[in-house]
Amino acid sequence: MLYACYDAVANEGKNAYNQFAPIAERFNGIISDLGLTLSLDDEYEVIIDNFRKKAGKDYAASRGEYLNGIILANYLGYEFVDAAKVVFFRPDGKFDDTLTDTCLASVLHGLSHAVIPGFYGANPDGTVRTFSRGGSDVTGSIVAKAINAELYENWTDVNGFLIADPRIVDEPKVIESITVSYTHLRAHETREDL
């Protein structure tokens, strides 16, 4: 939706508010479903303005993660840290680990919890750039390194937990309810245990 909106506004000159309305409706629905009083209207205005200024497809692609990060931080009561302010790329487009580590360590120092959207950062000129692959998984490992975390766990995106391996059992059912500790235990079992 964000790519299509960006193209319609930046390249086809269509009405930005009309094009962005379904996106705002989707995010406002999430906010409502979570029972939050958060308003993203100012963020929507900035995004629409940047679409008009042709901020680029990387910027457009990153805005869903950005808005979801704000919502999640609000829901959890954590600080929101925009990845474009703490994750950096060099002029050649490669990840700048030195600058990123320094900035992340400084910004996160003293914070007990923070939400940092994944899969994007900023070029030296401040424009948003997305990682070529790996996305949020990469960002998580970058943050873990910068804060000298003892452990970084990356749980792959799935549509739920199944009662059996779908490679072995046809159409296994989804587990309706599961605890984090049980999930953790199962994730670390060896193949022989299964």
Regions found by a protein language model. Give the residues of each.
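N-terminal low-complexity segments that are often proline-rich with Ser/Thr-Pro
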Residues: 192-194
